[in-house]
Amino acid sequence: MKPSPQFFLAAFLSLILQTGICYGIKWIALSKTPSSLALNQTQHCKQLEGLVVSQVQLCRSNLELMQTIIQAAREVIKTCRKTFSDMRWNCSSIELAPNYLLDLERGTRESAFVYALSAAAISHTIARACTTGDLPGCSCGPIPGETPGPGYRWGGCADNLNYGLIMGSKFSDAPMKMKKSGSQANKLMHLHNSEVGRQVLKASLEMKCKCHGVSGSCSIKTCWKGLQELRDIALDLKNKYLSATKVVHRPMGTRKYLVPKDIDIRPVKETELIYLQSSPDFCMKNEKVGSHGTQDRQCNKTSNGSDSCDLMCCGRGYNPYMDKVVERCHCKYHWCCYVTCKKCERTVERYVCK
């Protein structure tokens, strides 16, 4: 029996509900903003790529923030590529912003990581910009209430995490709070993962100190609260990516909640990344599912990790090639005070997947 038009319509609507495309990370396209765009007038906000209406409005009312947010978008791309350089999915599709492939358009494990990282990055970059004096609307973070130990004193300029979280979340969460921003399940998932990113950022705030004293004795330490580098935050989020939980949107009482798919009904943990759609293995190129494949990717023959030739090449084998490396050698220290080196060339064997 031939399926009816109503069947195809229902299937189409079901697909929309499953994928639930959301615009939450399209702002990463700000990384492509030309340096020639001064961003000193409100009409410039309309020229920025990847923003929804509410983000354009935030741009107009917070022009001084936009260069910092543009820098955050660039940091997201650089950090994601570096963090996943040894994995089959190497975050290369993030550079297609705002026109992502399905690996980031659907509610996948990969999109969970990018949402978390982008939320952490924008707050991190704003908090640091306050410290360096790049933003007129904020300054150093507050001095902690607790008394430091003997030989320590509060000073320096703390990263303004509170301001970074407030302004960063206003901007990065704005698309998910629109009425037309995909299915309710996807909005809940993206907001959850963004909050996980900010939690990891908050947990990275640590005491940093500088020594003072006669002849380097370090008799007194001036300390402040500072955030870890974004690359360290990304590594924590990568571990959460590897252990992410698949969820479903299930009725519980009078409302629907995201709950783990394969576990007895329980609330989703606030500290775990979650996803709705399973990902492919990313072995073969298939743009329909956002997979670039691993053909011609470099692999490590001696590694036991994710960059090993066995895992990276998905059992297809690999080809060796010789690569010339130029490096500094025969370095000498000269009094006083400089070092001279020669340049040496050596040949190393590398491997790429078939």
Curated annotation (Swiss-Prot):
Palmitoleoylation is required for efficient binding to frizzled receptors. Depalmitoleoylation leads to Wnt signaling pathway inhibition. It holds the Pfam family wnt. Gene3D superfamilies: 3.30.2460.20. Keywords: Developmental protein, Disulfide bond, Extracellular matrix, Glycoprotein, Lipoprotein, Secreted, Signal, Wnt signaling pathway. GO terms for cellular component: cytoplasm; extracellular matrix; extracellular space. Belongs to the Wnt family. This is Protein Wnt-11.
